[in-house]
Curated annotation (Swiss-Prot):
Pfam families: Presenilin (PF01080)
Cellular compartments annotated: Endoplasmic reticulum membrane; Golgi apparatus membrane
Source species of the chain: Bos taurus (Bovine)
Spans annotated as Disordered: 1-71
Annotated protein name in UniProt: Presenilin-2
Intramembrane segments of this protein: 415-435
Amino acid sequence: MLTFMASDSEEEVCDERTSLMSAESPTPRSCQDGRQGLEDGESAAQWRSQESEEDHEEEDPDRYVCSGVPGRPPGLEEELTLKYGAKHVIMLFVPVTLCMIVVVATIKSVRFYTEKNGQLIYTPFSEDTPSVGQRLLNSVLNTLIMISVIVTMTIFLVVLYKYRCYKFIHGWLIMSSLMLLFLFTYIYLGEVLKTYNVAMDYPTLFLTVWNFGAVGMVCIHWKGPLVLQQAYLIMISALMALVFIKYLPEWSAWVILGAISVYDLVAVLCPKGPLRMLVETAQERNEPIFPALIYSSAMVWTVGMAKLDPSSQGALQLPYDPEMEEDSYDSFGEPSYPDVFEPPLPGYPGEELEEEEERGVKLGLGDFIFYSVLVGKAAATGSGDWNTTLACFVAILIGLCLTLLLLAVFKKALPALPISITFGLIFYFSTDNLVRPFMDTLASHQLYI
């Protein structure tokens, strides 16, 4: 699921440079300050000259702090769409690429994740049968069971969220994070050390896993640097993808990838889809979705104590910038200030205020997992050559780019799996069955193009 991390209503603050000034920062000059200056004897000619300079000044989109306010230049929405669209592509390409690189590098180097010595409890039907029809039937049955479990767990989560069972959800997510950050990390680190023949004593290993897991729990479920939180979310997505790659049967994995993309389409776009209901409920309550479920490309909320002057309550102002102060003096030696708009935003001294710091996009961790499963399966199964792996990698990035383009156009939550997974499956089977035999034939005849 892919969605903008913007304000829930058009009247709310939505610019990335907007913040509420504290009492310690110099207060920007408003229109009321200007009128008071005239009453105190300030030169009217100076004020008119200052207004004339501001009127002829080139319009800067960053000076407009709220959508829908008077004075927004025409075409600003299109400029913001292009600006944030390109920015969001880069902000999501990097984590998705890193997650897939971790998975592919592990698959190519650690043999443990390519050995088939067990199956998940959700895929009980074995594919070790010579009959193609029986193998296909077993893969379809495994897919039905897997999708049923996913649908049931999603609906259960939505019901818990709708009835405000936050403690139960937090406990559920904390238990999942504990298992991923401690147990799966211990298994992963042990296999990597075994593969590269690196000796490590158990106390050091336990201390390393403990530090890694403890910091991850704090960053994901409490507070921590955004970059560190993003790194942990990428890592747990890669660990979960590796588990699926190891324990999902080959045919079942491909059928599940196709089915999960269809389910994602239905769950997000249908009026009564569970993921759509989850997003709409969070928007109605003006609450962020749990960080353990969502990768955010920017900081979601900042909380601070703002000491507001009673005379300026409700004024929405731009942040104080020391560099702007040096260049903000007009020809008469008086500082000129950016425009100040005053939407009806009540405030009280000492009130704890929440503000949106930066616009961004959110991508569900499930999308990271299934992107990596597709690329990892391409690297682990069949020929496992690099042409097929790179083709799937490029296909997923192309699909993600198209999804972000649609997100900028429709400006609502969209499923992130269908386009990317469809392209990935097409590229995988076409490359594995057409391009790879062609390249092998050229290589066997020593022909180079």
